[in-house]
Amino acid sequence: MDRVRGCAFLLGVLLAGSLFAFSVAKEETKKLGTVIGIDLGTTYSCVGVYKNGHVEIIANDQGNRITPSWVAFTDSERLIGEAAKNQAAVNPERTIFDVKRLIGRKFEDKEVQRDMKLVPYKIVNKDGKPYIQVKIKDGENKVFSPEEVSAMILGKMKETAEAYLGKKINDAVVTVPAYFNDAQRQATKDAGVIAGLNVARIINEPTAAAIAYGLDKKGGEKNILVFDLGGGTFDVSILTIDNGVFEVLATNGDTHLGGEDFDQRIMEYFIKLIKKKYSKDISKDNRALGKLRREAERAKRALSNQHQVRVEIESLFDGTDFSEPLTRARFEELNNDLFRKTMGPVKKAMDDAGLEKSQIHEIVLVGGSTRIPKVQQLLRDYFEGKEPNKGVNPDEAVAYGAAVQGSILSGEGGDETKDILLLDVAPLTLGIETVGGVMTKLIPRNTVIPTKKSQVFTTYQDQQTTVSIQVFEGERSMTKDCRLLGKFDLSGIPAAPRGTPQIEVTFEVDANGILNVKAEDKGTGKSEKITITNEKGRLSQEEIDRMVREAEEFAEEDKKVKERIDARNQLETYVYNMKNTVGDKDKLADKLESEEKEKVEEALKEALEWLDENQTAEKEEYEEKLKEVEAVCNPIISAVYQRTGGAPGGGADGEGGVDDEHDEL
C-alpha cells in the first residue's frame, strides 16, 4: 500500500517547462473547412459562423436564434429543441433537459444526487457514471450517456448551420464553462465526436464572450470582468484586452448555479402554497411539475421587466385551474442566498488577478440570468456604483466569440481576425500525490495555457521497482480533499536504494485545457504517459464508436420520419388543392361534367378518409395513394383544360396545382 500511496518524495525540483503563449491563427489551418462556433448551453444552445467579414448567428428551423437544449422521445420519433420542450408537460418522463449538469460527473457526485430528485426523467448508475434511462419508440427502454444526449443537441446545431450555409460542416469550436474540470471538457469533446464533429477547439465561455465584446475595440489596455450567469453554470473571468490580445488573468465560478436553480425556488414556493391552500401535494406529479416548471421560467423572465406577474396554469391538478401572483420582491427573497453566492467567485477572481475594484474598466454581462435586476444591483454595489456594460447580447455573445475563434482556426477570418491572440488559463491547480497524501502542485490555477511543467521525483522505499503516479486537481494541500483525475504505474525501474532513481513527471495542458501526463525514468529512459481519462468517467473508444453508430441510426430514423411527413403533406396538399379547384366557380366548378365532378369528388373523399385512418402510414403508402388519386383526377382535369383551351395541370390562374409540392407552414 505504501508503494502506491507514497510513490514519490520530492528530491530536487527541475522546472523544465515554462509558460508559453501561442498564436491560434497558425494551428491546423490547412486541414479545416469552415469552422462553426457552438455555445452548448445547459438550457439553450446557439450557433454562429464567421462569413463575409462578420459573425452570423444562425436561426433554427423555427426562426429562433437560440434553441432549447432539450431532447424528447415519443412513440414514433425523436424531438430536439423547441419541439421537445413544447411537449414536455404531456411527456415528462421521456423529455431530457439540463444534461450539461451531468456531463463529465460521477454518479455519486452530490450535485448529481440532488438533480436526480428534481428532474422527471430517470438517472441510473452505469459504471459509476450517471446515464439517462428513457423509453424510446415501441416502449423499448434505453440508457443514454450525457455525452450522447449532448451530441443530439450538437447535431441539431450542426444541421442548423448546414441548412444556412448549404454545405456539410465537419469542424466546430465548442464552448464550456471556464470552471469546467478536465473530465467535463473531455466529455464535451467526446459529445462532438458522437455528433460527427471534429471539435477543433474547446474554449471557455467567458473568454468567447470577451471576444464578442472586444473584437472591434481599439485603443489602450483595458481590464474587463466577464460575469457569465447562464441557465445552469456560473463563471467569472477577468481579462486584459489590448489591441486584439485577450489575456485571462483569473477565472472562478460554480458549475452548478444558474437560472434553473432560480426556477426551482419558484416551483418550491408554489408547491408549498398549493399544499397549504388546496391540501394537494404535486411534488411527485411529473405532469403538473412540467407545467409549473414552464410557468416558473416564464414568470422569472417577466419579472426582469415588471414588478408583478400572475402565474396562471389551466388544469394544474384534478382539473383545478391555478392562478397566483408573484412579485419581484418575493422572487428576490426566494433566491437571495443564490444571488449573493455569485459574489464569492467575483471576490476570488479579483484577488487572484491582483486588481483593485477601480482597475476594472468594464463589467460585461453574459447569460440570460444576468437580466435579473437584483443580480445587476449586487454587481453594481460591489463595484461601488459602476454600471455593467450591456453592449453584448447575453444570449448570443458566447456563440459569437466561438465563431470568431473558428474563423481564426480555419483561416477564413482574414485580416479582421489575424491579429487576435487568446491567452487562456487552467482554472484549477493540477498536481500529483507524494508521500503522506500531500498534493504536490505542478501547474497552479490561472496558469496560461497551453503549458508544460516537469519536476523530478524519486522513490520512497529501497529496491522499489514501480511507482504509481496519481494525478489530482484542486486547491487543497492534501489529495484526499482534491479530485482524483487518474493514475498510472511506471514499472521496470532498476532496484536501488531509496532516493536514488530519478523519475521526471511532465504535465502538459493543451489549448483545450485537457491534461496529458508523462513519467520517465531518467536512468533507463523508460516512460509511460496518459491523457487523463478520469478513471471510470471517460467513455472508451469502443463506447464512442458505438455511440457514433447509434447517432447515425437515429439521424437516419429522423430522416425517414421527415420523409414520411413530407409524403403525407404532399398527398394532403394535392387533395385539398384539387378539392378547391373542382369546387370553385372561378376555377373548374362550372366546366366539369357532373359525372366527372362526381368521380373526382369520390376519389378525394375516399383519399381523405384513408388519411384519417392511416395517420402513421409509411412514406411509400402515401406515395402510392397519391398516384391512385392522381390517376383518377389528372386525366379528367387535363380533358377539361383541353375542352376549354386552358393549360393542363396547373389551373387557369396557376393554382389548384397538381404539382404543388411546397412544404406547408
Swiss-Prot record:
Taxonomic superkingdom: Eukaryota
SUPFAM superfamilies: Actin-like ATPase domain, Heat shock protein 70kD (HSP70), C-terminal subdomain, Heat shock protein 70kD (HSP70), peptide-binding domain
Residues carrying sugar: N614
Compositional bias of kind Acidic residues: 656-665
Entries under InterPro entries matching the protein: ATPase_NBD, BIP_NBD, Heat_shock_70_CS, HSP70_C_sf, HSP70_peptide-bd_sf, Hsp_70_fam
Gly residues bias: start-end ranges: 646-655
Entry keywords, A to Z: ATP-binding, Chaperone, Endoplasmic reticulum, Glycoprotein, Nucleotide-binding, Signal, Stress response
Signal peptide span: 1-25
CDD domains in the cross-refs: ASKHA_NBD_HSP70_BiP
Region ranges (Disordered): 642-665
GO terms for cellular component: cytoplasm; endoplasmic reticulum chaperone complex; endoplasmic reticulum lumen; membrane; nucleus; plant-type vacuole membrane
Entry's Gene Ontology BP terms: chaperone cofactor-dependent protein refolding; endoplasmic reticulum unfolded protein response; ERAD pathway; protein folding in endoplasmic reticulum; protein refolding
Compartment annotation: Endoplasmic reticulum lumen
Protein function: Key chaperone involved in folding of secretory proteins in the endoplasmic reticulum (ER) lumen. Involved in ER quality control for seed storage proteins during seed maturation. Functions as a sensor of the ER stress response, and provides suitable conditions for the production of secretory proteins by alleviating ER stress.
Something else known: The kernels of the over-expressing transformant exhibit floury and shrunken features due to defects in seed storage proteins and starch synthesis.
Subunit (UniProt): Interacts with P58A, P58B and ERDJ3B.
Name of protein: Heat shock 70 kDa protein BIP1
Organism of origin: Oryza sativa subsp. japonica (Rice)
Lineage: Eukaryota, Viridiplantae, Streptophyta, Embryophyta, Tracheophyta
